[in-house]
């Protein structure tokens, strides 16, 4: 067991346009090589495209709903018992839920064909908003794995 104290959570300020802490965390996840201004440009451009395509007045509400649709509820964790390793289903902590959803959205947006990340991100957010696409499939696969290993749920720690 670690003798050190737990690291304190950093409080990040909201983003400059919408004042949302969640959106600022998303921008930080999109950022590569410390280029935050480029990440902001990509995310704000994607939000505008997203809101325009869906006819939303407030892009932030649509973004939060898309993120909510992508959040996993259960995941599997490896647990070694004796000589065997079991995939034990556990509930995902609230912070980790949003973190995983953001990572999946960004990963699938980057893997979309085409050069423009802004367009890929907007399309992935639209897919999440409509409960379809690669991110939602990843979430369903995670839930399916947890459901398949429900027999090992008593190995929780």
Swiss-Prot record:
Name recorded for this polypeptide: Small ribosomal subunit protein uS7
Task performed by this protein: One of the primary rRNA binding proteins, it binds directly to 16S rRNA where it nucleates assembly of the head domain of the 30S subunit. Is located at the subunit interface close to the decoding center, probably blocks exit of the E-site tRNA.
UniProt keyword RNA-binding present: yes
Alphabetically ordered keywords of this record: Ribonucleoprotein, Ribosomal protein, RNA-binding, rRNA-binding, tRNA-binding
Pfam family, one: Ribosomal_S7
An example molecular function term from Gene Ontology annotations: structural constituent of ribosome
PROSITE patterns the record matches: RIBOSOMAL_S7 (PS00052)
One cellular component (GO) term of this entry: small ribosomal subunit
GO biological process per UniProt: translation
Similarity comment: Belongs to the universal ribosomal protein uS7 family.
InterPro entries given in the database record: Ribosomal_uS7 (IPR000235), Ribosomal_uS7_bac/org-type (IPR005717), Ribosomal_uS7_CS (IPR020606), Ribosomal_uS7_dom (IPR023798), Ribosomal_uS7_dom_sf (IPR036823)
Entry-linked HAMAP family: Ribosomal_uS7_B (MF_00480_B)
